[in-house]
């Protein structure tokens, strides 16, 4: 990478890969959780994530590039960690708590990436990309807030 535009495109490919990987991994998480509100929130976010992939394709188009992913080691690690929780978790309440924590780790990663991409788009004068990325960033923040609320009000107290 030699320019900010290069870094922007590389990171865009990274999150495109990540969102596609998340859509493949999330159904297993949904199946593994037993809390109804958490299950619903994750199902809603899966639908939202599929929409975000389409939005990312529009971002690529807005900068004159073809949508493509580049392997994201960070998301692979977070997914692997989540799979470990699914396989090793025994108590339903503790498993729900650990899985919501893993899901929030993914959300925090996405928030960091989309925040960076949005600001780079602004710096590069890519107004359409900036607006589209702002929309995704807002969705990720809302998803994280919803998970946080469920964790605080329903999951963490019984997990003691």
Regions found by a protein language model. Name each.
Residues 1-160:
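Amphipathic alpha-helical hairpins
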């Amino acid at each position: 990478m030699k320019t900010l535009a290069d870094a922007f495109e590389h990171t865009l490919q990274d999150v495109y890969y990540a969102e596609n990987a998340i859509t493949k991994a999330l159904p297993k998480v949904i199946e593994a959780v037993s809390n109804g509100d958490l299950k619903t929130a994750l199902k809603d976010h899966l639908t939202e994530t599929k929409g975000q992939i389409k939005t990312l394709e529009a971002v690529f188009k807005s900068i004159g590039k073809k949508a493509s992913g580049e392997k994201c080691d960070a998301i692979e690690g977070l997914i692997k960690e989540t799979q470990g929780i699914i396989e090793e978790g025994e108590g339903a309440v503790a498993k729900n708590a650990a899985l919501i924590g893993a899901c929030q780790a993914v959300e925090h990663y996405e928030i960091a990436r989309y925040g960076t991409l949005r600001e780079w788009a602004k710096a590069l004068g890519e107004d359409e990309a900036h607006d589209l990325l702002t929309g995704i960033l807002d969705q990720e923040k809302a998803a994280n807030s919803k998970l946080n609320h469920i964790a605080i009000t329903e999951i963490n107290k019984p997990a003691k």
